[in-house]
Amino acid sequence: MRLSARLPGVQKRIVAESDDVIDLSTLHRITLPSGVTRVKRIEYLADVRNKALDPMTSGEVTEKYERVLFLNDVIFDVEGAMRLLWGTNVNEEGKAEYKAVCGADFITSWKYYDTYATRDTEGYSIGVPIFPWFGGRGDSTSRKDVLAGKDAVRVKSCWGGIVAFDGRFFQKEIAKSTTSSSKEREAQNSDHVYERSSSLAELPLKFRSEPESFWDSSECCLIHADILATPDFSDYTTNTNEAWGEGIFMNPFVRVTYDAKSFHYIKYAKRFERLFTPWQAIINHFAHLPRYNDRRMENEGDIVEDRLWIPNSFTPEQEQAMIDLQKNFGGKYGNASDSMEKKKHGKRDQNQKVTGRERVVTWIMRE
């Protein structure tokens, strides 16, 4: 009732798990070495987010929505949310243009929180989570944007507790009339540039999880990968500018926290946070941050080798778990079986402790 009173004339609908229970039996399960099966946390979270979007993605709601805003269990203010939605990367006509834009969430007034889903323009994870948050690897574009005081810091992905998307990515009939051919991007003066996926994601997009048993990628990160595999909408006007990047931004002026005390003190921390800059760079250097990620440069369809610890003996449950692991390897959105036949590598031997296995990169692919 209080919500209705404060939002007169605004259409609203609440999707609650108590009314529409998620069927856990439909979710992908992994088998642990003990033989016990578990639902992967990220797959569950992806399903929850898809459930919230279902009225839009299913076509049940016929109205067209310009923006979709996700909020975690955070303390925020309306001014910040409005700034994120309508005041980020504003074009000459005064309209905000982005594929996605996130705020910045903090676990304390000075410590950045979202290290899991945040990646800079070249796919590096962040450095020490104090201002300016990003590390100095590669071209350091994201770090430079923060230091330049931009409200549209170019990134590869982020979430930050509050994130807004171009609503067309989640609406069923939009693609037929508003998408155009994706522009070609050439890698220039850098050995650390991602290639755009050759397989285009279909609209409406849905959140998903990484199907491998013992590797997780955040659903908040994978949704950005799928956005990047989607052609640009034809009415973007700033996507030819260098400042556009991939069209995914962080707005560091929009900040949220997970408790009221931290939110209260953020305004004070912002006054002196630039003093952290040299110290953050020094700590990044000696702590070797961002950490090395052997998957950062993988492209869809690449064949790569993983190393897997194999004990000298197996219980029947462990043996079955290993069989299931190899059988399901290749993922929910692809199949590595053809590659395995072409290159028999890492055949398991009871006398070996470490073996290899082959997989096909499918992290951007969709069914």
Predicted segments, located by residue:
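Alpha-helix termini
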Residues: 7, 55-64, 87-96, 229-243
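Generic preference for well-ordered alpha-helical elements
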Residues: 42-49, 65, 78-81, 167, ...
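Terminal low-complexity segments of carbohydrate-biosynthetic enzymes
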Residues: 192-194, 199, 205-221, 225-367
